[in-house]
């Protein structure tokens, strides 16, 4: 679907220069002299490159709609991750680099993820916002340490390092944000 250059919004996926780009940031500029334009920061969906582009209101840009499908994570072997389509039971394999080394460490057997694809080709993956993990190692609580925002380092069951409150001990299950590995709360 073609849209005008001034209709580009952050999050839009565009076909520009024969490549898929996502609009990260848009600034609409109305100079005193000349026509209005949109200054758009684009990120390449395939290799992560960034590009700043200027679109006039009259410019036409191809807006792409990505297919989003639920997949279940099955297992990891070497540098490949195997997922199964929840509806057709068809399996796909993606390289760990495609997902990202740190993000791949949050994947657990049976976890549901959303795979975004364009023309049957996977181009992105969305993990759940939060996952439940066990604290594998952390420092013991120091009595009398009552600072309001004191966190201590911890290593989680998936090997990721995080900061947890002083009351969290080894073996406890906590909920962690997959975006940055930060502590959210204790698991029930």
Swiss-Prot record:
- Keyword Protein biosynthesis among record annotations: yes
Mind telling me which InterPro entries this protein's record contains?
Answer: Elong-fact-P_C, NA-bd_OB-fold, Rib_uL2_dom2, Transl_elong_fac_P/YeiP, Transl_elong_KOW-like, Transl_elong_P/YeiP_cen, Transl_elongation_fac_P, Translation_prot_SH3-like_sf
Pathway annotation: Protein biosynthesis; polypeptide chain elongation
UniProt cross-references to SMART domains, sorted A to Z: EFP, Elong-fact-P_C
One GO molecular function term of this record is: translation elongation factor activity
Where does it live in the cell? Answer: Cytoplasm
CDD domains hit by this protein: S1_EF-P_repeat_1, S1_EF-P_repeat_2
Q: What is its main location?
A: cytoplasm
What Pfam families does the record point to? EFP, EFP_N, Elong-fact-P_C
Q: What are the record's GO terms for cellular component?
A: cytoplasm
Q: Which GO terms describe its biological process?
A: peptide biosynthetic process
Which keywords has UniProt assigned to this entry? Cytoplasm, Elongation factor, Protein biosynthesis
- Give the similarity note: Belongs to the elongation factor P family.
Q: Which PANTHER family match?
A: ELONGATION FACTOR P (PTHR30053), TRANSLATION ELONGATION FACTOR KOW-LIKE DOMAIN-CONTAINING PROTEIN (PTHR30053:SF14)
The entry's function note states: Involved in peptide bond synthesis. Stimulates efficient translation and peptide-bond synthesis on native or reconstituted 70S ribosomes in vitro. Probably functions indirectly by altering the affinity of the ribosome for aminoacyl-tRNA, thus increasing their reactivity as acceptors for peptidyl transferase.
Which HAMAP family does the record match to this protein? EF_P
Full protein name: Elongation factor P
Q: Which organism is it from?
A: Maricaulis maris (strain MCS10)
Ranked from the top, the taxonomy reads:
Bacteria, Pseudomonadati, Pseudomonadota, Alphaproteobacteria, Maricaulales
Q: Which gene encodes it?
A: efp
């Amino acid at each position: 679907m073609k849209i005008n250059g001034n209709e580009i919004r952050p999050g839009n996926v565009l076909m520009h220069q024969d490549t898929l780009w996502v609009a990260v940031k848009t600034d609409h500029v109305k100079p005193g002299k000349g026509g209005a334009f949109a200054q758009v920061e684009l990120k390449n969906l395939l290799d992560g490159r960034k590009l700043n582009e200027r679109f006039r209101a009259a410019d036409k840009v191809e807006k792409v709609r990505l297919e989003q499908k639920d997949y279940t994570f099955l297992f990891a072997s070497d540098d490949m991750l195997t997922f199964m389509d929840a509806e057709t039971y068809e399996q796909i394999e993606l390289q760990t680099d495609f997902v990202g080394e740190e993000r791949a460490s949050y994947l657990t057997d049976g976890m549901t993820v959303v795979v975004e694809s364009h023309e049957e080709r996977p181009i992105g993956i969305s993990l759940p916002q939060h996952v439940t993990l066990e604290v594998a190692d952390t420092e013991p609580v120091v009595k009398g340490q009552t600072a309001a925002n004191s966190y201590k380092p911890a290593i989680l069951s998936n090997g990721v390092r995080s900061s947890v409150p002083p009351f969290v001990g080894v073996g406890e299950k906590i909920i962690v944000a997959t975006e940055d590995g930060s502590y959210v709360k204790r698991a029930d």
